[in-house]
Amino acid sequence: MEGHHFWEQQNEIQEVRFLVPKDKRKMEYPFSIPAVRECGEIKFSSPVTIFTGENGSGKSTILEAIAVAAGFNPEGGSKNFTFSTQNTHSQLYEDTQIVRGTHRAKDGYFLRAESFYNVATDIDEMDRTVKRGPRLVSSYGGKSLHRQSHGESFLSLVENRFGGQGLYIFDEPEAALSPVNQLVLVRHICRLVKEGSQFLISTHSPVLLCIPGAQIYELSREKGRAFCACQAEETALFRFYSGFMRAPHRVMQELLKEELFLMKNPPFQLERRVFRRDMRKDF
């Protein structure tokens, strides 16, 4: 699939604008995050947009704001999910404007690894309480997501619930998947894109980072470079994994230099050596 692009896709979300306060005294969270302040607006020119960056860089905050502004439940699920277990989302969605194209998604889902358990619980609860119509679980492979492993339930959701012409927002989906199953997810994403879907994804996965034709934004806390468009190979994530895999043992030795020294030289041995050395000084 190298070199294969999907630029012809018409996205529902064309652009997102964040109304950053002009008054610096109002620069509290989430506007205290450099990436939120600097991005201003995000244009979506590809059906797959990826946000990557270190923990705390603002990936999930931005993705969550877009999802909630688009009408999704902050904790995840389709637009029909209304459950709430804990109000932890930021208020950035209130200052988020979504510019939509003429295309309208026929389906949609906001998937968060951290609250996927709550989504699965809500599906089971609705099936128990709503007696009329087909059971919801039939759209998820016919088996409760709680009766599958985390990775199995995630892929079951994508394989059975997601269809073409959808808007799908994933917050760190790799948390549920092995590297091999991340490749399986990539195949599903590319299939759904060909069927007219749009994906917004935040990730720490070098596998997902390399989805063909994806538009990539790298976030950091570096002033002036907190929100940058780039290629996969230019990201800190890609460069880190490339360097690590070339020389994993050397990286570990450098990282754990002091710990490895202590492993070879237990503290009681070091104390005896220091004691003997000090005695020689005294005599």
Question: What label would you give each PLM region?
Answer:
Residues 4-40:
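N-terminal pre-Walker A segment at the start of P-loop NTPase domains
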Residues 54-55:
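The conserved Walker
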Residues 58:
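Conserved glycine(s) of the Walker
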Residues 140, 144, 148-172, 180-192:
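GG-anchored amphipathic helix commonly corresponding to the ABC/SMC/Rad50 NBD signature/C-loop
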Residues 180-198, 205-283:
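C-terminal lobe/lid and adjacent interdomain/linker elements of RecA-like ASCE P-loop ATPase modules
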Residues 62, 201-202:
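Conserved D-loop beta-strand region of ABC ATPase nucleotide-binding domains
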Residues 50, 61-128:
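ABC ATPase nucleotide-binding domain signature region
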